[in-house]
Structure formats: C-alpha cells, structure tokens
A protein has these predicted regions:
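C-terminal output helix
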Residues: 89, 105-115
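C-terminal output/effector regions of signal-responsive regulators
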Residues: 126, 130-151
Length: 151
C-alpha cells in the first residue's frame, strides 16, 4: 500500500483529507514542518506528501526546498494544498520541485486523480531506472564477450 503524508496546521483539513484517502492509502500526518521532518525520519518509505503552503514556523515552501536538497527525500512527490492563488505562487513551487498544486477547499475526486497520477509517474521512473541498470549490465556483458572472442 502506498504511503502518503499530509502536512497541514489545520487539524480539520488533515482529518478530512485523511478520511478521503485512508481506504486506499496508508496515511500519516504532521501539523508543522518540524513534525513533518520527524515523520520523514520515522517513515522512509513515504511515496507522496500533501503539503500546505502556509503554516506557522516552517512554511511549506521552505520544507519543499529542504526535501528537494536531501538525497533521501528528493524523489518524494509533493503536491501543494493551498488557499493561496496566483501564477507567482505556482511558479515558485514548480521551480523548487513541487509536483502539482491543488486549491483548497479540496475536491475529493481531483485529489485522488492527482495523487494517482503522481504515483504512476513514480512507478514509471522506478521502472525506467531498473531498465537502465539492466541495460548497463547487458552492455557490460556484451563488452566482456567481445573482449573474450576478439582479443
């Protein structure tokens, strides 16, 4: 089962999104950026983060920058959940590595579709990496055989 973390200081929003996702996904939550970093330490198998942009202390944008600079967490997809509007906000988010945006209040069907799309993209990336490694191994083996046959 895929694992998703919701990071939002609004406890009601967390509860609503969690209820929408739990039948299909394992869901953990954090109410601050600092709590999110702690949860990341405990849950290295996270697949996706739903991240509020505006939180006290550590903002969602700052947390995104930390995640994308980390070797351990840079591949986790991040979808911003925000009440902020404007192209500048989205440009900053995408520039810093956000996977997508979703406007609050969240539409349940759109949320599920965006999550599934990001998880599908992750699966394709993982398959691509596996195929690249297999291809490199085969290429090395072919080189080895050629060197044995044609000294």
């Amino acid at each position: 089962m895929k694992k998703i973390m919701i990071v939002d200081d609004d406890v009601t929003s967390v509860a609503i999104v969690k209820a929408l996702l739990e039948p299909e996904f394992e869901v953990v939550s954090a109410n601050t950026g600092v709590e999110a970093l702690g949860e990341l330490q405990r849950s290295p198998d996270l697949n996706l983060i739903l991240l509020d942009m505006v939180m006290p202390g550590v903002s969602g944008m700052y947390l995104l920058k930390v995640l994308k600079k980390s070797e351990n967490w840079s591949n986790i997809s991040v979808i911003f959940l925000t009440s902020l509007e404007g192209v500048d906000i989205e440009l900053e988010g995408f520039t810093n590595g956000a996977s997508d945006f979703l406007q609050k209040p969240v539409n349940a069907e759109l949320l599920r579709l965006k999550i599934k799309r990001q998880l599908f993209i992750q699966d394709l990336k993982a398959e691509n990496q596996h195929l690249q490694k297999t291809l490199q191994t085969l290429h090395s083996r072919i080189d080895q055989v050629f060197n044995e046959v044609l000294p």
